[in-house]
């Protein structure tokens, strides 16, 4: 919308004033697909719209009853990328995979593990739907989508999400279980790393680096992923940028020791949608993204900090601004 465009430009202007140089743009999720992909028009015809939105808080099961939707055309995206570039800001796009896939599966049911038609969810939080990574058509879909994304964003880094994958969809799929057996993969966490590495290889063939939330390492940082199947035996592809958001800070050190670069977005310090009681201004300002106990060479593997504004329960631009400012200025100083 015009209002959304104005707001994005205002945010990019503020970032430029604060000399912040990367804008991470989360473009797909369970509750909506927000970027036009010309090869798959239903992603925005179907996936960009939901019937209602959960309000108040997670798991409230209270809904506003108002249809919600919208997306950015490729021309819209080009304009924003250009506007940011003129202010020395690189935009890193995020296309979620293999979880947070409900909007895509609602658009094309064959992308999921059951093939059943679902609706774009109206409630927020983590959903059970995941891409059927055992189906070559689904891998082709991911590559087709990324091909169009790469053409729009000059960023050398492409973010593939990878967070909060519930393993149930894979465990309950005979096709996925057979695929794991064929590839000698012993756990769903290992399958996620295997899938992620295939996407990394594709991006590398296009001269792009992959970035993803820290579950892409196979770390089971969410309670619902600790299913007794054990840690992943698969090794994440070298050159991947790991976006740390959850888990014990020791995971950062372990990840760096394995040779990966890090962006630190530890949620208890950096989530802008958290209220000021959880993250007061002083806490924002004092956050050190480099954990203790690293050598000088290891410290250089921490690229910086990311601060996230998740919009589930942010109904207006005014309420968003109250949460972003002045904390954004504090993060710019970190």
Outline where the language-model segments fall.
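Conserved, mostly hydrophobic/aromatic
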Residues: 15, 91, 160, 203, ...
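Short, well-ordered coil/turn segments that N-cap beta-strands
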Residues: 19-21, 85-89, 154-158, 206-208, ...
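Active-site-proximal loop/turn and secondary-structure-junction residues that shape catalytic pockets
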Residues: 27-31, 39, 95-101, 164-166, ...
């Amino acid at each position: 919308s015009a209002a959304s465009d104005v707001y994005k430009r205002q945010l990019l202007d503020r970032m430029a004033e604060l000399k912040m140089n990367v804008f991470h743009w989360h473009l797909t999720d369970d509750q909506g697909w927000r970027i036009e992909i010309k090869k798959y028009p239903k992603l925005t015809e179907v996936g960009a719209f939901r019937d209602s939105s959960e309000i108040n808080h997670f798991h409230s099961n209270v809904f506003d009853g108002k249809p919600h939707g919208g997306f950015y055309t490729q021309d819209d995206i080009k304009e924003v990328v250009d506007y940011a570039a003129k202010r020395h800001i690189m935009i890193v796009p995020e296309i979620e995979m293999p979880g947070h896939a409900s909007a895509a599966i609602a658009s094309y049911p064959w992308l999921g593990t059951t093939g059943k038609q679902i609706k774009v969810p109206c409630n927020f939080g983590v959903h059970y739907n995941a891409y059927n990574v055992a189906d070559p058509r689904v891998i082709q879909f991911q590559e087709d989508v990324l091909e169009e994304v790469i053409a729009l964003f000059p960023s050398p880094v492409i973010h593939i999400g990878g967070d909060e994958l519930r393993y149930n969809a894979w465990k309950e799929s005979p096709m996925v279980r057979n695929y794991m057996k064929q590839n000698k993969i012993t756990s769903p966490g290992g399958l996620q790393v295997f899938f992620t590495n295939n996407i990394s290889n594709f991006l590398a063939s296009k001269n792009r680096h992959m970035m993803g939330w820290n579950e892409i390492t196979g770390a089971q940082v969410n309670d619902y992923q600790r299913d007794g199947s054990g840690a992943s035996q698969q090794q994440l592809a070298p050159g991947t940028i790991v976006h740390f958001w959850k888990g014990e800070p020791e995971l950062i050190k372990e990840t760096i020791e394995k040779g990966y670069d890090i962006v630190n977005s530890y949620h208890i310090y950096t989530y802008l949608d958290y209220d000021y009681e959880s993250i007061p201004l002083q806490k924002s300002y004092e956050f050190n993204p480099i954990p203790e106990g690293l050598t000088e060479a290891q410290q250089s593997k921490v690229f910086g900090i990311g601060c996230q504004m998740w919009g589930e329960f942010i109904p207006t631009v005014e309420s968003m601004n109250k949460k972003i400012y002045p904390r954004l200025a504090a993060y710019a100083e970190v």
